[in-house]
Amino acid sequence: MTIEVLKERIPDFAKDVRLNLSSMASDETLGEQTKYGLLVATAIATRNVEVIAAIEAEAAGKLSPAALGAAKSAAAIMAMNNVYYRFVHLASNKDYATMPARLRMNVIANPGVDKADFELWSLAVSAINGCGMCIDSHEKVLLQAGVSTAAIQTAVRFAAIMQSVAVSIEAGAASLAVAAE
């Protein structure tokens, strides 16, 4: 499965989503590794098997094994960190912010790819997962590394599109299941 096949799976009620996916696929704002790592990380964050399979197929040959692994690591480590740090951020009791997290996250310091790419992927996954504290932290690191606000916005736009693709496909499948009853 590829992005083209994925587009065909998007129901007509989500035509805008289909068009956004087409625009994202042809967007050349980001470098190849940055873009395809971003697509893989955000696809994984949607938790939709069809989306993940299509994006991984699309990324095949465009990402080195190290970059593919790093993109998957970004999604995995953010799945943990986004829950923990969203709690720390939202809890009324601010004592939690002073406590050690006691979570292993060595991959952040040594992702095996360009640090800015990994941070951008982590920021996009954090946007999907809704962790404001993580978003702020990754944005700060990216800006210090010289990544433009336009590139950051592109990453978050891609995350938004990827999430909407997953939701649209799931909504279409649910509609078909109901119609079949």
UniProtKB/Swiss-Prot annotation:
<dbReference type="InterPro" id="IPR003779">
    <property type="entry name" value="CMD-like"/>
</dbReference>
<comment type="function">
    <text>Antioxidant protein with alkyl hydroperoxidase activity. Required for the reduction of the AhpC active site cysteine residues and for the regeneration of the AhpC enzyme activity.</text>
</comment>
<dbReference type="GO" id="GO:0015036">
    <property type="term" value="F:disulfide oxidoreductase activity"/>
</dbReference>
<keyword id="KW-0560">Oxidoreductase</keyword>
<keyword id="KW-0676">Redox-active center</keyword>
<keyword id="KW-1015">Disulfide bond</keyword>
<protein>
    <recommendedName>
        <fullName>Alkyl hydroperoxide reductase AhpD</fullName>
        <ecNumber>1.11.1.28</ecNumber>
    </recommendedName>
</protein>
<feature type="active site" description="Cysteine sulfenic acid (-SOH) intermediate">
    <location>
        <position position="134"/>
    </location>
</feature>
<dbReference type="InterPro" id="IPR004674">
    <property type="entry name" value="AhpD"/>
</dbReference>
<keyword id="KW-0575">Peroxidase</keyword>
<dbReference type="GO" id="GO:0006979">
    <property type="term" value="P:response to oxidative stress"/>
</dbReference>
<dbReference type="GO" id="GO:0032843">
    <property type="term" value="F:hydroperoxide reductase activity"/>
</dbReference>
<feature type="active site" description="Proton donor">
    <location>
        <position position="131"/>
    </location>
</feature>
<keyword id="KW-0049">Antioxidant</keyword>
<dbReference type="GO" id="GO:0051920">
    <property type="term" value="F:peroxiredoxin activity"/>
</dbReference>
<comment type="similarity">
    <text>Belongs to the AhpD family.</text>
</comment>
<feature type="disulfide bond">
    <location>
        <begin position="131"/>
        <end position="134"/>
    </location>
</feature>
<dbReference type="GO" id="GO:0045454">
    <property type="term" value="P:cell redox homeostasis"/>
</dbReference>
<dbReference type="Pfam" id="PF02627">
    <property type="entry name" value="CMD"/>
</dbReference>
<dbReference type="InterPro" id="IPR004675">
    <property type="entry name" value="AhpD_core"/>
</dbReference>
<dbReference type="InterPro" id="IPR029032">
    <property type="entry name" value="AhpD-like"/>
</dbReference>
<dbReference type="GO" id="GO:0008785">
    <property type="term" value="F:alkyl hydroperoxide reductase activity"/>
</dbReference>
